[in-house]
Amino acid sequence: MKNLTTLLILILIISGPSFANKVNIFEFTDTELSELEVRKVRGADNKTEYSVGSNDNGNYLKAVADNAASGLGKKVKIDLNKTPIINITWKVEKDLVGIKENTKKGHDFAARVFVIKKTGATPLSNRAINYVFSSNNIVGFNSPSPYTKKSIDN
């Protein structure tokens, strides 16, 4: 995974924004929200509640979790030669205090975006980079997932 991360960083350095094509993955509409795949996290009591809103900056997705964990998924093929940059904007209203995010018990984040590269026939063979909004670490931190060596939390 270290090589993958290094490769990703090199691609980002070599390819400036002027060379990148913009691909909007989400439009954040009620119709789109109803079509997204929702996956409840094993062991969670409830699913996260999702809704769509808008403000001066455009549409957004709001997620509220109370003893809940789930994710929204959308499969998209991206050509990294044409679109090597990911741009994530998020607003967190409440940090998760008192947890150790790099442990299985505390592996929780106020916001998280998974970028998964399919590398084999099963989900366990995939590689992932998880862009996270950490409540307890400095900007730029990264850590291997406590669940698998094939996933890095950034």
Predicted segments — roles?
Residues 108, 112-153:
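Extracellular/luminal beta-rich ligand-recognition
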Residues 24, 57, 84, 107-111, ...:
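Residues that flank catalytic or metal-binding motifs in active/ligand-binding sites
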Residues 89-95, 118-120:
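Solvent-exposed strand-to-loop "edge" motifs in beta-rich extracellular domains
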Residues 7-15:
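Bacterial N-terminal signal peptides
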Residues 1-5:
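Positively charged n-region of N-terminal signal peptides that target proteins for export
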